[in-house]
């Protein structure tokens, strides 16, 4: 009887394991691409499960405990731990170890600031559901911007800088038209105008997809935090993970909230502390049908 050398068996086992992991990574990436239209990785996906630790006794919320939008948000893809926070002009805003993680959300241009990202995420959710016609945003000044009206309008600014839509010949719906409108929405939004598009909610009711917004009297200076995920224990106590952008466009990222980068979880009191230094602040929820 001929025996296969042990080292050959080891090589075969290692190769089979590597191939299996590669195939599993491709399947995971394909599943994320179907759920998140912006996802571009082809061989793997980084998630809350793979990147973060859960405190003892806590678990993630399941689909029966959240709305479809909240559950979609809670499954968002992340970047690996070595990704720094880039800025739109090139270079870095933060080194990788200065934040918890970067959210895997492709972007390009100066309108992707901390006010713009929540609008961008809402637009991606509606696109995922093929409900683009429901995208509508009240800007800083002027006409409400909605996708159906946009398809038979052109965009101009008044002398006071207000958005005005002038009726023109109907255009066909397209990815180009959708993102062109999104760019205008983000460009003409500020902290205060963002609150005109959402409903105020008690901080204790906050859930994935909700916003924490604080701003000054004029509404031009402030902060926006986006609730990415929520965990709960048997006593009903909840912890949250938030993400944000920068006043000058940068990667959407999860700030370093604790000494351990793998522990992004904070309670409702700390959520409020993020924005309570501003004279106007609160927790808010999108009006999603």
Question: What residues fall within each predicted segment?
Answer:
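Low-complexity, Gly/Ser/Thr/Pro-rich intrinsically disordered linker/tail segments
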Residues: 238-289
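Extracellular-facing segments of soluble proteins and assemblies that are Gly/Ser/Thr-biased and enriched
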Residues: 104-199
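Cationic-aromatic interfacial patches
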Residues: 24-107, 112
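A generic structural motif
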Residues: 138, 213-217, 245
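...with weaker cross-activation on analogous glycine-rich loops/strands in unrelated enzymes
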Residues: 172-236
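Bacterial Sec-dependent N-terminal signal peptides
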Residues: 1-26
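Substrate-binding/catalytic groove segments of enzymes
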Residues: 127-132, 219-221, 233-238, 251-253
């Amino acid at each position: 009887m001929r025996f296969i050398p042990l080292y050959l068996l080891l090589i075969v086992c290692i190769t089979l394991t590597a191939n299996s992991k590669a195939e599993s990574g491709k399947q995971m990436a394909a599943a994320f691409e179907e759920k998140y239209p912006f996802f571009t990785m082809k061989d793997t996906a980084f998630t809350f499960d793979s990147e973060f630790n859960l405190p003892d006794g806590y678990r993630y919320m399941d689909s029966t405990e959240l709305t479809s939008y909240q559950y979609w948000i809670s499954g968002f893809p992340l970047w690996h731990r070595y990704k720094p926070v880039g800025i739109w002009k090139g270079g870095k805003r933060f080194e990788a170890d200065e934040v918890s993680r970067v959210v895997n959300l492709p972007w390009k241009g100066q309108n992707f600031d901390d006010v713009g990202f929540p609008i961008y995420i809402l637009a991606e959710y509606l696109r995922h559901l093929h409900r683009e016609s429901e995208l509508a945003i009240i800007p800083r000044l002027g006409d409400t911007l909605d996708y159906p009206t946009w398809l038979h309008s052109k965009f101009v600014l008044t002398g006071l800088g207000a958005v005005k839509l002038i009726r023109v010949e109907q255009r066909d719906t397209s990815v180009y038209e959708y993102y062109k409108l999104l760019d205008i929405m983000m460009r003409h939004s500020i902290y205060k105008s963002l609150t005109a598009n959402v409903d105020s909610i008690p901080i204790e009711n906050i859930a994935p997809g909700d916003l924490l917004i604080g701003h000054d009297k004029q509404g031009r200076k402030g902060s926006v935090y986006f609730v990415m995920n929520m965990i709960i224990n048997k006593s009903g106590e909840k912890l949250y993970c938030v993400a944000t952008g920068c006043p000058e466009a940068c990667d959407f990222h999860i700030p370093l909230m604790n000494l351990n980068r793998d522990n992004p979880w904070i309670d409702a009191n700390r959520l409020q502390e993020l924005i309570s230094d501003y004279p106007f602040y609160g927790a808010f929820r999108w009006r999603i049908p």
